[in-house]
From Swiss-Prot:
Domains: entry comment: The VHS domain functions as a recognition module for sorting signals composed of an acidic cluster followed by two leucines (DXXLL motif).
Cystine connections: none
Protein name as catalogued: ADP-ribosylation factor-binding protein GGA3
Gene: GGA3
PTM comment: Phosphorylated by CK2 and dephosphorylated by PP2A. Phosphorylation of GGA3 allows the internal DXXLL motif to bind the VHS domain and to inhibit the recognition of cargo signals. Ubiquitinated.
Pfam families tied to this protein: Alpha_adaptinC2, GAT, GGA_N-GAT, VHS
Source organism superkingdom: Eukaryota
Compartments (UniProt record): Golgi apparatus, trans-Golgi network membrane; Endosome membrane; Early endosome membrane; Recycling endosome membrane
Stretches the record annotates as Unstructured hinge: 299-593
Low complexity bias locations: 364-374, 441-459
Length: 723
């Protein structure tokens, strides 16, 4: 066997499928399989190489490639199965047997073996639904007349299905206690065991009832969204009847009522529960159809842009999120689904919804959008980038702002940092908006340097960090104290992010300090007139001295003015260690990699995100973990407008430094995959278990995608700084 050192996947495959081989060389075939398992992007690269070899005009080379593919399916595990089970690869196999493509030029031996492999996979891998779809499509078109006989050696042995876990009966402590009681000969212990069994059964029944209620709610939401979406698609102001409008209004009201229900479900669902993704998806679909109704029926403009409408599928997922479609579908119209990357002539998408004209520009400063928002109007399959209601709630709970792009430009109006900050305009708490309590949107912050109001080139202050959510049990303050509904006090804290172009050198000046003093006086008066506190005491904003001089803007967050609003009925937790990461900046070149294995945070459609952990903590902060986020693209399409956001529990803090870029070029077999790096800082002073949720938005080709996920595989906290 040749020297394995330095061998690549391509060299292994070239030797395994060499047309000069007299017989199948299993040394190189197994070496190819082992190399797939070793490499991080092994399955993604391997299927592309195999697709090219399988379509070889030389029969012997193609047959050897199919043998290699069969061996990989048996030896390379689920990661390889997932890549084979995508339409991108299945379309390449269909081209081999379809007369519309290569079927007339390929030998019968090759076509027969392809059909045998597809059929064996449908039997052994029922979870890969796309393989079954591809095989049934070939049968419908008459390419496959009958199911071929499968030899025993070609049959994949499916792994046994995992035993369904019952969180109640799988409780290790209760199981040990129950076993101990049952082994005892004491009648009291047996009676106690009986009580324990009954309590476990009741707990399981309550869990099942909760799951049933959740499924019923999700089904009801998806049905309402689907019906309202279909009616909006066919709505015409001239032709639609009053009955249709009444039905749409009723569906709209039901969707509005279900938004709170979904948020409550999301807050009650465990972080590791797989159904959390379904709840978030249903919430996104709900917000999308509500925005579409307001745009089409009521003529409103949602977040400064016109909402586009997409129909969710039967499972509640939006059609625009499909990974691809099969080719050769008997001339079926596929305009509503994404054309395959490998299809020779993709059909341009069409839509039944008239594209509404953009809203007229206001006389004030124009509302900025990120590059991903600007691409939201590319076609009907693009999802609306308007923040959903659940997104707003999550952002209020501490979702990190997207980091600025590098290199930033000097112009604040054109800088990508400014665009990304204004994309989260709902985080501007200074000016409340009707209908929102914790989150409000405003086009101009309250505090600005004195300047003529007509100037449109004045750069606004950076958006403040999120304010604490005020519980619904607290009575709403009067109109005179509306400042309290949006958490003014924490919003006044200065942001000292070092990488904010256009704002870094902005001084408030004397005028802004007078604004600050006037606002302080207004807060004191509002507390008394609103009836929330007595004139003699101030539980909302504690003060240390009766008469406080004018605060310089450099005053830290510990000063009374910057204390967050709290209520005695809520029970404020004791102040923990310092969480601020504003003054910490870790250059990428100074980071030393650790021996800890990287964690895959996202891996779909050739776009992959990995978390690499640094060996050391920042100086003076042993509670901060440095993570290098690597974004890789192995897809044949470019990935653009990449924005990563992160959120952690309230006892922690997360900060994303500017990424090295926002675009990834398409994959090339002769060059290494394109990559983006971004440094993430995670503060955990209480040394709790880390659970990080992320929101990822990007455009793969022309398709906009929004993904939400969670990562909890972080190194043990006690090992931070010495990984």
């Amino acid at each position: 066997m040749a020297e394995a050192e330095g061998e690549s996947l391509e060299s292994w495959l070239n030797k395994a499928t060499n047309p000069s081989n007299r017989q199948e060389d299993w040394e190189y075939i197994i070496g190819f399989c082992d190399q797939i398992n070793k490499e991080l992007e092994g399955p993604q690269i391997a299927v592309r190489l195999l697709a090219h070899k399988i379509q070889s005009p030389q029969e012997w080379e193609a047959l050897q490639a199919l043998t290699v593919l069969e061996a990989c399916m048996k030896n390379c595990g689920r990661r390889f199965h997932n890549e084979v089970g995508k339409f991108r690869f299945l379309n390449e196999l269909i081209k081999v047997v379809s007369p519309k493509y290569l079927g007339d030029r390929v030998s019968e031996k090759v076509k027969t073996k392809v059909i045998e492999l597809l059929y064996s996979w449908t039997m052994a891998l029922p979870e890969e639904a796309k393989i079954k779809d591809a095989y049934h499509m070939l049968k419908r078109q008459g390419i496959v007349q009958s199911d071929p006989p499968i030899p025993v050696d070609r049959t994949l042995i499916p792994s046994p299905p995992p035993r369904p876990k019952n969180p109640v009966f799988d409780d290790e402590e209760k199981s040990k206690l129950l076993a101990k009681l049952l082994k005892s000969k004491n009648p009291d212990d047996l009676q106690e065991a009986n009580k324990l069994i009954k309590s476990m059964v009741k707990e399981d029944e309550a869990r099942i009832q909760k799951v049933t209620k959740r499924l019923h709610t999700l089904e009801e939401v998806n049905n309402n969204v689907r019906l309202l979406s279909e009616m909006l698609l066919h709505y015409s102001q001239e032709d639609s009847s009053d009955g249709d409008r009444e039905l749409m209004k009723e569906l709209f009201d039901q969707c509005e009522n279900k938004r709170r229900t979904l948020f409550k479900l999301a807050s009650e669902t465990e972080d590791n529960d797989n159904s959390l993704g379904d709840i978030l998806q249903a919430s996104d679909n709900l917000s999308r159809v509500i925005n579409s109704y307001k745009t089409i029926i009521e003529g409103q403009v949602i977040n400064g842009e016109v909402a586009t409408l997409t129909l969710p599928d039967s499972e509640g997922n939006s059609q625009c999120s499909n990974q691809g479609t099969l080719i050769d579908l008997a001339e079926l119209d596929t305009t509503n689904s994404l054309s395959s990357v490998l299809a020779p002539a993709p059909t341009p998408p069409s839509s039944g919804i008239p594209i509404l004209p953009p809203p007229p520009q206001a006389s004030g400063p124009p509302r900025s959008r990120s590059s991903s928002q600007a691409e939201a109007t590319l076609g009907p399959s693009s999802t609306s980038n308007a923040l959903s209601w659940l997104d707003e709630e999550l952002l209020c709970l501490g979702l990190a702002d997207p980091a600025p792009n590098v290199p930033p430009k000097e112009s604040a109006g054109n800088s990508q940092w400014h665009l990304l900050q204004r994309e989260q305009s709902d985080l501007d708490f200074f000016s409340p908006r009707p209908g929102t309590a914790a989150c409000g949107a405003s086009d101009a912050p309250l505090l600005q340097p004195s300047a003529p109001s007509s100037s449109s080139s004045q750069a606004p202050l950076p958006p403040p960090f999120p304010a604490p959510v005020v519980p619904a049990s607290v009575p709403a303050p009067s109109a005179g104290s509306s400042l309290f509904s949006t958490g003014v006090a924490p919003a006044l804290a200065p942001k000292v992010e070092p990488a904010v172009p256009g704002h870094h050198g902005l001084a408030l000046g004397n005028s802004a300090l007078h604004h600050l003093d006037a606002l302080d006086q207004l807060l004191e008066e509002a507390k008394v007139t609103s009836g929330l506190v007595k004139p003699t005491t101030s539980p909302l904003i504690p003060t240390t001295t009766p008469a406080r001089p004018l605060l310089p803007f450099s005053t830290g967050p510990g000063s009374p003015l910057f204390q967050p609003l709290s209520f005695q009925s809520q029970g404020s937790p004791p102040k923990g260690p310092e969480l601020s990461l504003a003054s910490i900046h870790v250059p990428l070149e100074s980071i030393k990699p650790s021996s800890a294995l990287p964690v895959t945070a996202y891996d779909k459609n050739g776009f992959r995100i990995l978390f690499h952990f640094a060996k050391e903590c920042p100086p003076g902060r042993p509670d901060v973990l440095v993570v290098v986020v690597s974004m890789l693209n192995t897809a044949p399409l470019p990935v653009k407008s990449i924005v990563l956001q992160a959120a952690v529990p309230k006892s922690m803090k997360v900060k994303l430094q500017p990424p090295s870029g926002t675009e990834l070029s398409p994959f090339s077999p002769i060059q290494p995959p394109a990559a983006i790096t971004q440094v993430m800082l995670l503060a955990n002073p209480l040394k709790e278990k880390v659970r990080l949720r992320y929101k990822l938005t990007f455009a793969l080709g022309e398709q906009l995608s929004t993904e939400v996920g969670e990562v909890d595989q972080f190194p043990p906290v006690e090992q931070w700084g010495n990984l």
